[in-house]
Amino acid sequence: AAATPQYDSEGNLKLDNLLTSTAISIKQGNVWEPLDDAASIKDGTQVQVEIVYSVPANAFPDGGNTATYTLPAGVYPKGDLSGNITDSTGMIIGTFALSKKSPTVTFTFSNDTSRTFTGTFKFNTTINYAETGGDGKIHLGEKTYTVEPEYSLNTKKEHTLSEDKSKVSYTVTVNAPNGTHDQTVTITDRLAAENTA
């Protein structure tokens, strides 16, 4: 049974419950290969997000031709994007627009919306662990992907010699540019036994 059309507060058709398939793909050579439904993806990986939707006949309000879709956290665009959307035959049926770091995609259709049609929307982005709110999950349609956080620590150790050259003071600076993802980080700084006399 076809899903009942739903509308946002501005009267735009919502595609969120009209999806027929979704995929997150990674590039293998020159080809985008869809990941398995429960795949893990490393933070910072370049991916292609794809949704396929089926719009029932006359789903748009009178005179309307715009629809929206809410992207899941973790795959928000890293810049403003726009482009064409196609039907199941590859024919252009309208355009999409996305704003940097916004979850809402806006579609403007130019095809005959009085008949049922299927459309495909794709865009490329970078997986972002921090956007997932700390649980590391991306929920796209009925699929859930796990983001593996990318850990990195930068350390720096500097020393200062006292004026009388009898003491050395050390300063150790540690920073985590990608955050610690709620993981405990333990730093140990020891002098070798032969250097303690």
Q: What annotation goes with each model-predicted range?
A:
Residues 2-59, 125-184, 188-193:
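Serine/threonine-rich, low-complexity linker/repeat segments that form flexible spacers/stalks
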Residues 58-60, 78-82, 118, 179:
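Generic local-structure boundary detector
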